[in-house]
Structure formats: structure tokens, C-alpha cells
Amino acid sequence: MKFFALFIHRPVATLLLTLAIALCGVLGFRLLPVSPLPQVDFPVISVSASLAGASPETMASAVATPLERALGRIAGVSEMTSTSSLGSTRVILVFNLDRDINGAARDVQAAINAAQNLLPSGMSSRPTYRKVNPSDAPVMILTLTSDTYSQGQLYDFASTQLSQKISQMEGVGDVSIGGSSLPAVRVALNPVALFNQGISLDEVRQAIAQANVRQPLGNVENSQKRWQIQTNDELKTADAYAPLIIHYSNGAAVRLSDVATVEDSVQNSRNAGMANSKPAILVMIRRAPDANIITTVDNIRAAMPELRASLPAEIQLDVAQDRSPTIRASLAEVEQSLIIAVALVILVVFLFLRSWRATAIPALAVPVSLIGTFAAMYLCGFSLNNLSLMALTIATGFVVDDAIVVLENISRHIEAGMKPLQASLQGVREVGFTVLSMSLSLVAVFLPLLLMDGLPGRLFREFAVTLSVAIMISLLISLTLTPMLCARLLRAVPKRSQPRTQGFNRVLLAMQQGYGRSLKWVLNHARWVLLLLLGTIALNVWLYISIPKTFFPEQDTGRMMGFIQADQSISFQAMTVKLQNFMTIVSSDPAVDNVNGFTGGSRTNSGSMFISLKPLSERDVSAQQVISRLRIKLAKEPGANLFLMPVQDIRIGGREANAGYQYTLLSDDLNELRTWEPKIRAAFSKLPELADVNSDQQDKGAEMALTYDRDAMAQLGISVSAANALLNNAFGQRQISTIYQPLNQYKVVMEVDDAYTQDVSSLDKMFVINSDNKPIPLSYFASWKPINAPLSVNHQGLSAASTISFNLPEGTDLSSATAAIERTMTSLGVPSSVRGQFSGTAQAFQQSQSSQLLLILAAIITVYIVLGILYESYVHPLTILSTLPSAGVGALLALEWFGAPFSLVALIGIMLLIGIVKKNAIMMVDFALVAQRSGKLSAQDAIFQACLLRFRPIMMTTLAALFGALPLVLTSGDGAELRQPLGITIVGGLLMSQVLTLYTTPVVYLFFDKLRTIRRKAPEKDLSLS
């Protein structure tokens, strides 16, 4: 420690070094980005493919399976799921956390290219991919409304102008639009008129397609000029298509308007969107993987004036939902907790040291240590988020510890009559090793966490590094700035001149004297204390096993997502009514600010809702409580269910689900899976530990199954392809031509008039032109009957899959829910051909359970190794670590008392306690060893004196750590659900360990000393006998 004497003798250099650390920290703070949590996004790529009119089973077998076989060969894929519905397939690839998203995207594109030859030839476009997780909630939702423009026109503005501009902004990963579709010319055919004219639907299709052609025509030129040839070969509006001649009957022209209604409409008329019960187009913006939410949102908000200016004045563009306000509010709450923690810690120091001069020294060390940490955070690529700021808040009680130990020891020498300079040199020499041991052993706690892979390791890496850097800067400050300031600021102050702290000092002295008397009794009854310590260890095990557990505290982000699941045979019109009814019910809740939703597209019986809650200051209930009371009202809506869940910043997995947790059933036998899934779902629905139980298996959709009489078809001269083309032309909203415009491309859509799609009897009016050009009714060669058929087909890996989703009732923990599910699966006797496994967050929870104890054990072993190296002893580290059981009991009991489940945040609190509570033992053992090795005191006298001498700094450091964590316990604003488990764990552990450690540590110290003495005497006895 002679090196640090240089800093005492060179105050200018020391102050400039401190200033440099602080300035670097200020610069780093200004450059740090802001986010709710560390970036822990799994690389996710979504592959989409479409085949108009294809059934879900066709999409699964002809499109999804070839894609899955090719994509499944990519390295680093942790999960591959697919969903095939009417005309569309989506394959979601979730990669390992260490997989580079850009490299994965290149592999995905190569796999799509390899599978291209295996895909159906009728696909209008190649499969595409996006580097975005479709199950993530949007970071921002914009709405377009107008009293003059139609939904299709609004959708066109959103797609053509807004989507393109927003997609180019930094941080934006995907822009999806809901509520309608692009404008189109729709041709609604009258099959009766066509039959009377002897015109087939395919003839109409060909006539329209041939009338709208775009191709190069060439040019004409002479020696002087050049002319580009241009024709009117393109038709762009319904008015242009209506007079089109499609057939001649007995020499008379039959125009399109004679057999159809032609109008300017939209590509898919079965779409609806609403914002607060008003028709609207929703623009849903999702961030790119690893993009910063605040930066992304700020970029969009900054562009809003430009976006509004690009739209007609009659169109209103509003921000319906924004993730950033609650993030900013949460971070402001943490920053406030940090300031309160610093103030409380400085107050503790003043009460103990009774001098503003002495208090100013740690009061300077604390902000320098914390501010300097920002520089390291910036260099490491971290952000200002809830966890990193929580680390700094907790660090407030740690960074002052080193300064307190040095300051208190120097103050003790000055009070004994030593000059300040000499006291500083002597004091830092005496406790330098103690401070080093305390800091290094605390940092050692986080080494296993830094080496841990997976989500927990990535999630808490910033927390561990931030806290470790703050502690190391604190160590440097305590050995340089603190003794230098002590040498120049501290003076021996008569106790009589401190009237304001005399009362506190008398209390502290009485406590110290009482502690001394009780310690003597404890040392004389050491056996009972050792039994108490063993009982504490056993109690730890029992509490850990019995305490409710969850993966990550459920956040109240002020946003909720809703998923509507209606009867599988519901029509689009009825589904739109359900959406309106549900939005009305949700909007009526006093805690709800606004509601937006849409339905339609490829999933006819489902819809999505996005709900914004009022700020926490304006509502007296949590998001989960809002869901609980809405659940009762929503259950009264017949024929449909609305499942609500709070939006979370951490969502694991890529499967889109109607609830927060999933259990997936897999089988290679689709029929057996469809047999067992309803039984398992029904059993899950009866469990009180689960709520909102639902499944993505939808195999009861209404389907009209046509059976061709092939003999009759051959006799009538009709091919299967001609019959299929009839059905596709009539009912498939078939896109038969393309309209090219400067900013976008639009379609011509053909189907029979809506009047002929409302009832099955319309099939009687359908006909095919045979090889003899005669109209043959469909009923001549086909029969039909209604059956059940799947609305979607799901795969996971290459197996058929059904995912049962569920939420947790208020007050239920995830460990109870998973245990109940496992018991139910065992009791049902599910065959081995049907496999069940947790997915998404529930799967991550189960995986974390198996690693938590290993992580705690690794932290303890790491601390033991570091202490063993520092003390050159196998025994003294055990004495120091004997403080841990009491801290564990206190932490777990505190969680039980507050009704908080044991989560990853609480686990970090336990690991922090491993580093905190051993500080007290280090201070005792260090002084006892010095006294004992000097030969002046016995082991019992040495540890007794050490306990009394270090009583004041032990109380100071413990209270500092306790008050540093106390604001996290008492917080109640945005993000409190994240901060409270950490504060509860630390405060509970500190309170319990403070009471017990003061007695168990000296007893364990003497126990090991006696063992060592016995071992030494045994060889001497053997030598005397020989």
C-alpha cells in the first residue's frame, strides 16, 4: 500500500485524476442511449409466402414444408415454427442469441432460393423475409382517419407514402398496415347473365387480362427526330373496364358491364380497422432487432410534421400508441431513487462521523464513482435502462463502503491524537488490504454471471458490469482521493462541540456496549450459535423450494394487447360486429385511454386490439387488475373471446399467441394431435392456476367439400383444372390483372357478385363451358356437403404442432402454473406419440430454474477462491462466507412478506447479498488476524476486540447499503414492479444478516481456530509418544 501514499503527498495530481474520471463520466452520460432494458433481442426472421385461394392444408404441405426443410438446415436455429392459413404461410425462425442477424438473413435468403423449385408454380411472388419478430408489440401505432376519403384510399396513402418513409428511418424493422387493403378494380360477375350468354368465367378473366397489357412498343425515328410509340393499352379505372367487350353473341357485343358490376374498391373487401370506434387505418411500427426504442420513436415523432404534410388536408394522422412515455417515466423514477439513495447514504455518514468535513469526503467519493461509471458504460455499448440505473442505485451503498472504512479508520487515529497526515498514511496502510478484499470479493460474485450464456446472462450483463465498474472506481477513489482529503480536511473535534449528534452517539454507544455484553454470552455458548447457523442453512433450502417463482416480474407498461378468437365458422360481417362490441366494452373501463383494433385478412375468425392505459398517476389499478375486471364483462359476449395481456419488454419466442405463456403439443400424427388437443385444453381450462386458456388449433372451420364425378366429367368433356378454375374465379377474389401507377401497383380482382356468395345454393348457378362450348352446370358433375376443416395448420420443427396459450390469474405465480400443467399431463395418460413442452417465456423459465442454484453456487465458489488467494488460507474464507445463510433467509422471508415471487431480479439480489454481507465478516476477521498474529491477544480476545472496534464501520456500511436499496422498496411509480424485488431482497437480507452475522462470524472464527489448534497439537502428541 506504499504506492497509494504518493496520492496523499501529491494532492494536485490526485484531484486532477478525480476530475478526469468525472469529466469522462459526464461525457459518457450525454452519449448513452436510453432504453427500458438491456438489448436482449433474440435474432428473429419472419419468412412469408402467399398463394391466393389455397387452403390452409395446401399451404402447409405445398409451401410451408418445402420452406421448412430448407430453412431447418441453417446453423444456429433454436426454434422454427410455421402457421399456414387461407392463402398465406408464415415461417418464424428464432436464432441463438450469439447468432448475427445479418449473417442469418443471408442464410435465410439462400435457403429460400434453394427451395424455390419445390414451391407451387402458381405463386404470384417469391417468398420474402423480414428481420423482425411478428409477435413483438409495436413500438408505435399511427392511425389515419378521414370523413371524405374511403378506407381503401387511406390504406393507399399509408402504403404508398407513409410506410415507405417510415421504413427508411433508423431503428424501424417493420411497418404493417391494417384495416383495409390497397385500392383495386373489382369485377363482380353475375353467373346467371353469364349462363344466358354462354360465357364462362375464365373467358371473362382472359378478356380482362388481354385488355390491360403493358409491354415495350419501340420507337420511330428519322434523321432529325425520334418518337416513342405509346398506346392506350392500359386500363386504370372501373369506368374504363366497364365497357370492355368480352364476347360476341350472335354478332352482338357483350360488354363487361352487361354481365358484371365494375367498381373502384379494394383488393380484399374483408378487412376492417377502427380507432376508438371510428373507421381507421392502423400503421403498426415495430423496431428492428437491437434497435433502441427511444431513438426509433423519437425519429418517427420528429418526422411527423413531414408525414402530415405529405397527406391531403382531409386526412388526419394521429399517434394512437407510443411505447416511450412509460419508459421515460420509469427511468425518471429510477433516477429519482438514485438521488434519494445518495442523499440517504450521505446522511448516514454524517450521523456516524458527526462532522461536515468528514461527511464531505465520502459525499465527494460517491458521485465521482457513479459518474465515472457512465464512461465505462458508453465504452461497453450499454444504455441507460432500468437495470443499469438500478445497479447504480444499489452501488450507492457499496461505493461509499470503501470510503467509510478508510475514513473511519483515519478518523479513529486522529481522535486518538495523531496528526491528520500521519493518520492518513497509517490508516490507509492498515485497511488497504481490507478494502481491496471487500471490493474484489464483491466483484467476484458477478464473474459467473458474466460468463453465463443465454437470456439471463445477456440480460444482467449490463447490471453486473455497471456495478463492478462502480465498485472498482470506488476502490481507486477510496485509496487515493479519500486519504488525501482526510489529510487536509479532518481535524480533531471535541465531542462537546457536536450537540446535534450527541443523542445519536449515545444511542450508538449504548448499542455497542450492549453488543459487547451479548457477544460475551454468545462466545461462551458457541454450540447453540453453531446449531442456529445449521438451522439457518436448512431454512434456506426449505424457503427456496417453497417460495413462489416466476421468470421476470410482470411489467405494467401502460399498454395491453388483445386477441379476439371467434367461432371458427363466423363470417367477416359478424366478426366486425364482435370487434366493435369488444372495443366498446374495453373503452368503457375508466383506466383505458384509447383502443384500436382490426380484423380480416387471411384469418377470418380473429382480430387484434391495441389498448393504451392512462398514466399510473391517473389510475389506481395495475394493468393486470384492469384485465381481471374486464375479463368478467368480456365473458358475456357470445360466440367470441377476447384475450388480454400486458405488453412486456421481454417476449421470448416467435410464435404469435393469444396469451402470455404457451405449452406446445407436437406429434408426427396430425389426427392423433387433433384428438388429444381438445382433451388437454379442456383439462387445462379447469385448473385454477390458469386463465384465458386457448389454442391455435382450429380444425372446426366450416368447409364445403365438393366431390367430382370423374366419369361424368369425362363424358361431358370437362377437365378438373377447368372445374377448379371456375371455383377460383367465382369465389377466390382472384387477382387477374395489374394496374401500374407511378407510385404503386394495383390489382383487378374478379369474383361473383356478393349476392351469390352468401349461400351454398349459389353453387347451383355455377357452370363450366365444356369442350363443345356448351355451359354445363356444376351440379351435373359434382356434389357437395358441409364438413369441418382447419382454418390454420401449425408446425414446429417439422412436426405438426398445437400451442395452448394461457395467462396467469392475478396473484398466481408461474411456478405454480407450470407444476399444475405437468401434473395434469401426467394424470391424463397422453400417449408417447403426442409430446408436450413449454414454449416461449414458460420454457425460458423452466430452463432458468435449473441454472439458478448452479449460478449461486458458482458465485459462492468464486468468492471463496478469491478470498482464499487474498488470505492464503482455506479456512478464513469459510468464516467469511458463514454470513450468507442468514442473508438468504432474510431475503426469502422478505419476498414472502411482500408477496413477491422469486424472479431473475430477486436472484440478482441474492447474488448481491453474497457480496454485501461478507463485508462485515471481512472487517472482523481482518482485524482479528492482525491482532492475533501480533502475539498479543488470544483468538477469542482478538475476535472480540475486532467486533467492538469494527462495530461502528459495520453499522455504517450496512446502513449505507440498506438505505441505498430502500428507495427501490418504497418506489411506486412506473417500473416499480422491476425495482421492488431487488430492493426487497437486499433490505431483507441485510436486516437479517446484520443481526446474526455480528454473532455467528466470531463463533465460526473461534470454531475453525480450535480445529486448527487441534490439528497442530495432534502431530506434536504423536512426536512425544514416539
UniProtKB/Swiss-Prot annotation:
Keywords: Cell inner membrane, Cell membrane, Membrane, Transmembrane, Transmembrane helix, Transport
Cell compartments where the protein resides: Cell inner membrane
Subunit structure of this chain's protein: Part of a tripartite efflux system composed of MdtA, MdtB and MdtC. MdtC forms a heteromultimer with MdtB.
Bilayer disposition of the protein: Multi-pass membrane protein
GO CC list: plasma membrane
Phylogenetic placement of the source organism: Bacteria, Pseudomonadati, Pseudomonadota, Gammaproteobacteria, Enterobacterales
GO molecular function: xenobiotic transmembrane transporter activity
This protein's encoding gene: mdtC
KW Cell membrane (keyword) present: yes
Transmembrane domains' residue ranges: 12-34, 336-353, 360-382, 431-450, 463-485, 525-547, 853-875, 895-917, 948-970, 985-1007
Family indicated by similarity: Belongs to the resistance-nodulation-cell division (RND) (TC 2.A.6) family. MdtC subfamily.
UniProt-recorded name of the protein: Multidrug resistance protein MdtC
